Amino acid sequence: IMESLTGIMIAFLIFFSAKLIMRGELEVNNFFSFLAAMMLAYQPVRSLATLNIAINQGLAGARRILPLIDYKNEINENDSDVNIVITNAEVKFKNITFKYNSTESEVLKNVNIDILGGKMTSLVGHSGAGKSTILNLIPRFYDCNEGDITIDNQSIYSSKIQSLRKNISLVSQDTTLFDDTVRNNIAYAISDATQEQIEEAAKYSFANEFIEKLPNKYDTLIGENGIRLSGGEKQRLSIARAILKKSQIILLDEATSSLDAETESKIQSAINFLTKNRTTLVIAHRLSTILNSDKIYVIEAGKVVGEG
């Protein structure tokens, strides 16, 4: 708009100045001096208008970011918290009761679960039964209202969060990816990983099959949240991350849901490699996902109603 208005103003200026020159009321050299001065002043004025746009965009961004900066973390550490030391990675839920701040009713009620070290434990039940909540309590995305969760007889509530999460890998159906290269997305948790380690993780997660077909292979940008990848390809990158991290505790939240049979078969093979001899908690609706489980808990309305 400003460019158009400036063009119109210059056209009018030349038109009226020409009439004044023809009548002898304006000298030609004065006209060109004024026109040159006006053109020199145009760029700074235009920059001011652009600056105003940039300032407004910055203010709009600040309004979105400031609430995040001011957000108070619901999970707080105490000065007495210590680094957790994990050997067998046996996880126990002891009389856990939990409800979200936004709800009145309890989501989990007196839950007792033993997750065997180096074994696979599965949670089954209807949607909304509380399975994902159980899984999210282990890395302390939330803290329970009553009871305790221990790993190798150490309470996670007296452990430093960073040391706890360092030993946990999460693979879910909603994989979070960044607008970066394939390499950096795999090495998200291990920033100093070598190219050889990254390629090895991709190999065992079957991600190398599609990575080798990408234009720049491991240097290919995958777009915001991996928009250039399919659902199965995103899952394989997520598993590659977990393989590279080598965590002792693996959490799988419906990792093979919404996938076709061929893709699910590859994902399942990758999961089998990932979870071998590691403490694993699986949430799934498909029978194929829990066939290799050492123990199964049935969850209904926030309670354990069966195990075997």
Listing of model-derived features with the role each one plays in the protein:
Residues 1-11, 54-57, 74, 97-99, ...:
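An intracellular "coupling" helix at the cytosolic face of ABC transporter transmembrane type-1 domains
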Residues 67, 74, 187:
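Conserved E/DxxT/N motif and adjacent residues on the DHp alpha2 helix
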Residues 78, 84-308:
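ABC-type nucleotide-binding domain
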Residues 1-33:
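A hydrophobic transmembrane-helix motif
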Residues 6-13, 57, 194, 248, ...:
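Residue-level signal for transmembrane alpha-helical positions in Major Facilitator Superfamily
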Residues 40-68:
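Cytosolic ends of transmembrane helices, especially the final helix of ABC transmembrane type-1 domains
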Residues 13-17, 44, 61, 207:
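Hydrophobic/aromatic residues in alpha-helical transmembrane segments
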